[in-house]
């Protein structure tokens, strides 16, 4: 499983499992099998 912090949304085929915070910006934690 590979996970990335992305914004504004996850790519198709990815599942959001949480959030990342980098500085004052929130990202979606997106994982793909």
From Swiss-Prot:
The lineage of its organism: Eukaryota, Metazoa, Chordata, Craniata, Vertebrata. It is found in: Secreted. Disulfide bonds join 3-31, 5-20, 10-30. Keywords: Antibiotic, Antimicrobial, Defensin, Disulfide bond, Fungicide, Secreted. HANP-2 could be a product of proteolytic N-terminal amino acid removal from HANP-4. It comes from the Eukaryota. Coiled coil: none annotated. The keyword Secreted applies. Bactericidal activity, greater against Gram-positive bacteria. Low anti-fungi activity. One of its GO terms (cellular component) is extracellular region. This is Neutrophil defensin 4.
């Amino acid at each position: 499983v590979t996970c990335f912090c992305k914004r504004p949304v996850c790519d198709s085929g990815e599942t959001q499992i949480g959030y990342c915070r980098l500085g004052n910006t929130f990202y979606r934690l997106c994982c793909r099998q």
